[in-house]
C-alpha cells in the first residue's frame, strides 16, 4: 500500500499518578518504530495557558506520519495503547483522553487553522472541535481531550516560528523520587550554546528544565538547535529511559493576539498608563491602564524580574503594548491582565513642581509654608515667587521587556530570534528524534 499522510493528535492523558501526554507519545513512537516515517518532528503544542480547567501545561502532541496502513486500524491500535496507559494512572479529575487521526495536510485547512488560533487565545468547546473535525474528514475518539487534539492539528505550519524541546524521561522505578540533574553542568552547557532557551534560572542557579512533580519527565531542555540540545544528556546524573526531540510553539508568543480582553483570553493590546504603579507586598506591581474604551489592572509579578522592575518605572501617559492572560475581576472591579511581555512605545514627559531659584544668588529657595513664600538658604533673601515646572529625565526607555530567563511561561516570548520551516511534509526517521538509553 502506498504511504499516505496522516496526523495523529493526543491530549488529556496527564495524571497525578505519573501520566504525561508527551511520555505516552514517546511510547507510541517506540511502538511504531520503523513501521512509519515521520513527515515532521513530533510536535509539542501548547494551547491557551489561561484556561482554568486545562491540564498542567495545556499541551497536546501531534505525530505527522507517512503511513502505509489503514487509518481506522491505526486509530484502534492507538486507542488501545491509550487505554492501557491510562488504566493504572487515571487522568486528572474532569479530564478525559482524546485521540484524533486526520488525513492529508490539516495545516492547510482554513477551518483547522482558525481552530488552532482560537484554542491558543480563547475558549474552545467540544462541539466546536468535533464539528471542525467532521467537516475536515478526521476520525476521533474520547472526551474533553479531543478539544486539544483537534486544535493542535494545524499548529506549526510552514512560516510559523518554532523552538525545540528535548525531553528526557525517567525509568519507571525512579518515578516519584528526587530528580538528579547537574545544575552546574547545565550552566556550563548553556554558556557553550547559542540557541538555548529558558533552561536555567541564573539568579538562583537552579535548573528550570527539571520539573518537580511525580510525572515521568526527567528534564526538558529548550532551544533552536537540536545538536546543542542533545549535549544536555551530559548534565543528567540519573540514567534516562528514553528521550524525544519535539518541535514546539513554546516561547513563540503565538497565543498573544490582538483582540478585546475577555476572561481567560490571551491578548496583545495597546494601552495608556492611567495611574502611578502600585507595588504590593511581595514585589508584585499593579498598573491601571486604558485602551481608550475600558480600564484594566495590568499585573506584573515579582518573579518576572526585569518586567516587574520596568513596570515600577511606568508613569501616567506612557503608551505601552501589554501581552498576557485576562483574569477575572480584581478587587477594584476591573479585569486583570497578567502581563507576560511589554513593549514601551512612548514615554510621557514627567514634570515636577519645585521652588524658584533665588534671584540674588541663584540657589534653590525653600518654602516657608503654604502661602508664606520662600527663603533662600544661602543668602537669606525672602521672596513671594512661584514654583517652577521642571522636566525630569525618565529612567524607563522605549523597548521590549520580558520575563526573567528560567521563569517564563511555556508560550511566553523571551526575545529570541526563532527559526521557521519552509515546507511540509518532510521525511524524518523515528531514530532521528527518539533515543533509548
Curated annotation (Swiss-Prot):
Alphabetical GO CC annotations of the entry are:
cytoplasm
Per the record, the domain of life is Archaea
**Reaction(s) catalyzed by this protein?**
cytidine(34) in tRNA(Ile2) + agmatine + ATP + H2O = 2-agmatinylcytidine(34) in tRNA(Ile2) + AMP + 2 phosphate + 2 H(+)
Tell me where it resides: Cytoplasm
Report the EC number(s), separated by commas if there are several: 6.3.4.22
> Where does the signal peptide begin and end?
none
Give the chief site where it resides: cytoplasm
The family annotation for this protein states: Belongs to the TiaS family.
Per the entry, what this protein does is: ATP-dependent agmatine transferase that catalyzes the formation of 2-agmatinylcytidine (agm2C) at the wobble position (C34) of tRNA(Ile2), converting the codon specificity from AUG to AUA.
Protein name in UniProt: tRNA(Ile2) 2-agmatinylcytidine synthetase TiaS
Which source organism does the UniProt entry give? Acidilobus saccharovorans (strain DSM 16705 / JCM 18335 / VKM B-2471 / 345-15)
The beginning of the lineage is: Archaea, Thermoproteota, Thermoprotei, Acidilobales, Acidilobaceae
Q: Which gene encodes it?
A: tiaS
Amino acid at each position: 500500500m502506498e504511504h499516505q499522510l496522516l496526523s495523529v493528535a493526543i491530549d488529556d492523558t496527564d495524571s497525578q499518578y505519573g501520566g504525561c501526554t508527551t511520555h505516552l507519545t514517546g511510547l507510541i513512537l517506540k511502538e511504531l518504530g520503523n513501521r512509519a516515517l515521520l513527515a515532521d518532528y513530533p510536535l509539542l503544542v501548547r494551547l491557551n495557558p489561561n484556561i482554568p480547567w486545562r491540564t498542567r501545561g495545556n499541551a497536546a502532541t501531534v505525530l505527522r506520519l507517512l503511513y502505509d496502513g489503514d487509518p481506522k486500524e491505526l486509530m484502534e491500535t492507538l486507542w488501545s495503547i491509550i487505554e492501557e496507559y491510562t488504566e493504572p494512572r487515571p487522568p486528572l479529575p474532569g479530564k478525559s483522553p482524546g485521540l484524533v487521526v486526520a488525513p492529508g495536510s490539516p495545516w492547510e485547512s482554513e477551518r483547522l487553522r482558525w481552530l488552532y488560533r482560537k484554542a491558543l487565545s480563547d475558549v474552545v468547546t467540544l462541539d466546536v472541535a468535533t464539528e471542525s473535525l467532521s467537516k475536515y474528514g478526521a476520525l476521533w475518539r474520547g472526551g474533553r481531550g479531543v478539544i486539544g487534539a483537534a486544535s493542535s492539528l494545524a499548529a506549526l505550519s510552514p512560516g510559523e516560528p518554532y523552538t525545540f524541546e528535548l525531553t528526557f524521561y525517567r525509568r519507571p522505578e525512579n518515578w516519584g523520587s528526587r530528580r538528579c540533574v547537574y545544575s552546574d553542568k547545565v550552566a556550563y552547557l548553556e554558556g557553550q550554546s547559542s540557541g538555548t532557551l529558558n533552561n536555567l534560572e541564573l539568579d538562583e542557579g537552579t535548573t528550570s528544565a527539571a520539573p518537580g512533580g511525580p510525572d515521568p519527565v526527567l528534564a526538558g531542555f529548550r532551544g533552536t538547535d537540536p545538536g546543542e540540545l542533545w549535549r544536555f544528556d551530559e548534565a543528567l546524573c540519573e540514567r534516562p529511559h528514553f528521550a524525544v526531540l519535539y518541535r514546539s510553539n513554546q516561547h513563540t508568543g503565538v497565543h498573544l493576539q490582538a483582540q478585546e480582553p475577555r476572561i481567560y483570553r490571551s491578548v496583545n493590546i495597546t494601552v495608556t498608563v492611567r495611574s502611578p504603579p502600585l507595588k504590593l507586598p511581595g514585589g508584585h506591581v499593579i498598573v491601571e491602564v486604558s485602551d481608550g474604551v475600558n480600564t484594566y489592572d495590568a499585573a506584573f509579578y515579582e518573579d518576572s524580574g526585569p518586567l516587574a522592575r520596568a513596570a515600577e518605572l511606568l508613569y501616567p501617559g506612557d503608551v505601552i503594548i501589554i501581552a498576557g492572560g485576562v483574569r477575572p475581576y480584581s478587587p477594584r472591579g476591573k479585569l486583570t491582565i497578567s502581563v507576560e511581555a511589554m513593549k514601551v512605545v512612548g514615554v510621557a514627559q514627567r514634570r515636577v513642581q519645585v521652588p524658584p531659584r533665588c534671584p540674588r544668588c541663584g540657589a534653590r529657595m525653600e518654602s516657608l509654608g503654604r502661602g508664606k513664600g520662600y527663603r533662600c538658604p544661602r543668602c537669606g533673601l525672602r521672596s513671594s515667587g512661584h514654583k517652577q515646572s521642571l522636566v525630569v529625565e525618565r529612567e524607563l526607555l522605549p523597548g521590549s521587556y520580558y520575563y526573567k530567563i528560567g521563569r517564563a511561561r511555556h508560550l511566553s516570548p523571551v526575545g529570541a530570534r526563532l527559526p521557521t520551516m519552509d515546507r511540509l511534509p518532510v521525511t524524518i526517521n523515528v531514530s532521528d528524534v527518539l533515543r533509548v538509553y
